[in-house]
């Protein structure tokens, strides 16, 4: 998979759980920050990203006929079109993220747990593709 063509799905906690004594609003902000920080880092490296946290804004603005259940279904559909997934810290405490991880495994989509390792893997894939292209040109 070439880096510039790879589509990365972000999975992690979005919905506040109240498990850490944080206010639900602060926990939501913290969770969203994690998604948008990862998205920005990937985009800065030229990687295309599917960020399900973007769908939360439709819920926040009260868009008619858009529910949390629909957002989760939409995420699973988007995941099926991705090449790789990045599990953000705390993913294992989110029922939605665990479902996305199971779906990624079912679809044989590689799941990374570290942004740096994901980027390194994509760069290695780019180099191998370039070597292969050069060999084919000979």
Regions inferred by a protein language model and the residue ranges of each:
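Conserved catalytic or regulatory cores that recognize and/or transform ribose-phosphate-containing ligands
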Residues: 1-138
């Amino acid at each position: 998979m070439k880096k510039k063509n790879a589509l990365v799905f972000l999975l992690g906690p979005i919905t506040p759980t109240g498990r850490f004594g944080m206010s639900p609003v602060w926990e939501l902000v913290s969770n969203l920050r994690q998604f948008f920080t990862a998205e920005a880092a990937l985009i800065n490296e030229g990687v295309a990203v599917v960020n399900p946290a973007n769908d939360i804004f439709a819920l926040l603005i009260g868009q008619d006929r858009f529910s949390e259940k629909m957002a989760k279904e939409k995420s699973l559909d988007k995941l099926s079109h991705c090449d790789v997934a990045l599990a953000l810290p705390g993913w294992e405490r989110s029922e939605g993220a665990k479902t996305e991880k199971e779906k990624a495994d079912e679809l044989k989509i590689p799941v990374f747990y570290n942004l740096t390792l994901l980027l390194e893997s994509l760069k290695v894939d780019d180099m191998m593709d370039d070597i292969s292209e050069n060999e084919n040109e000979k």
